[in-house]
Regions:
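Structural micro-motif
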Residues: 62, 68-77
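Short acidic active-site motifs
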Residues: 10-11, 60-64, 96
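Conserved redox-active cysteine motifs that mediate thiol-disulfide chemistry
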Residues: 25-42
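Non-catalytic, surface beta->alpha helical segment in thiol-disulfide oxidoreductase systems
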Residues: 78-105
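Conserved Rossmann-like nucleotide-binding pocket used by diverse enzymes
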Residues: 2, 26, 52-54
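Short pre-active-site segment immediately N-terminal to redox-active cysteine/selenocysteine motifs
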Residues: 18-19, 26-29, 72
Length: 105
């Protein structure tokens, strides 16, 4: 199952899960983001049932980006029960993302 796409108005509801929620903040014009897309979808498959993997287009979520200080992308934020518990900025390695997810389980 690929990562889910969440909108700005559903963000707070999505991150409130008792399961860890990895949010990939990306943009259609961002080449590194495009390269990470398939990896993010792989993580969604590998962690299905354990972690919710979501994507948010930064061009459509200005207030969320401002709230979390997102200025560089790709930007990965990990939430648990609505609280940010991890962050990776401009990460391009699957194993680093997996380590972040594994620590949250």
């Amino acid at each position: 199952m690929p990562a889910i796409h969440i909108s700005e108005d559903k963000f707070d509801e999505a991150i409130a899960s008792d399961k860890p929620v990895l949010v990939d903040f990306w943009a259609t014009w961002c080449r590194p983001c495009q390269m990470m897309g398939p990896i993010v979808d792989e993580l969604a498959d590998e962690y299905a049932g354990q972690v919710i993997v979501a994507k948010m287009d930064v061009d459509q979520c200005n207030s969320i980006c401002a709230r979390y200080g997102i200025t560089n992308i790709p930007n990965f934020k990990l939430f648990k029960n609505g609280v940010e518990v991890g962050n990776l900025v401009e990460e391009k390695k699957k194993n680093t993302l997996k380590s972040l997810l594994d620590r949250s389980l």
